[in-house]
Amino acid sequence: GALTAVMVRPVDTAVEFGELLGDKRYGTCIIGPGAGVGERTCDLVHTALGAQRHLVLDADALTSFAARPERLFESIKSSGDKAVVLTPHEGEFPRLFSDLSNKFPGRSKLERVRTAAERCGAVVLLKGPDTTIAAPDGRATIAANAPPWLATAGAGDVLSGIIAGLLAQGVPAFEAASIGVWMHGEAAREAGPGLIAEDLTETLPAVHRRIYDALGVEY
């Protein structure tokens, strides 16, 4: 089958990606889900950062830098003032921040994420039942609204998409990550137990309606 509502332009190399980003309308990128682990993915990330695009990095985009995470951090810090959000889970987090793993006692999750954000120069969102978000300037928040049935394959990819959508609308990185996590959890609550990732996109409109109603905004 085919999903004809989605427009697709294949990009196989960093050079092709750079050509695509020559169009300034592409202001925000997600790299990682399904990208594959390796230098090609690293090159795509460096290309997006070099083009100074807002960027959400997840999954393979994080693991690809496991051998030399400082390469990623240096690239982020040299990319100007564009928003960058890293969205690891506890398995991916130590691939970039090995000394901040939860295997080492004595540091809270909040402290670990704050340290990671300061080190890499990006907003870091460490997923889990108590998803923790921190900015390089020390701001941090913990989201506690995620139901247990949100732990399902592909749910993190949906979260990356929500955050990228907010970044594309001009929402700053820390706020986009915080709002995105809350909306993600609420969409899971709307869907109920037994959800699959695709259900989250179906229930997001109900979350939007609740927000609009609370704010008294017509839609």
Model-assigned labels for residue ranges:
Residues 28, 32-34, 152, 160, ...:
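Alpha-helical transmembrane segments in multi-pass membrane proteins
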Residues 101-102, 168, 189-192:
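Amphipathic alpha-helical interaction elements
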Residues 186-219:
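Charged C-terminal helix
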Residues 95-98, 152-183:
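Short, small-residue alpha-helix embedded
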Residues 148-150:
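Glycine-rich phosphate/pyrophosphate-binding beta-alpha loops
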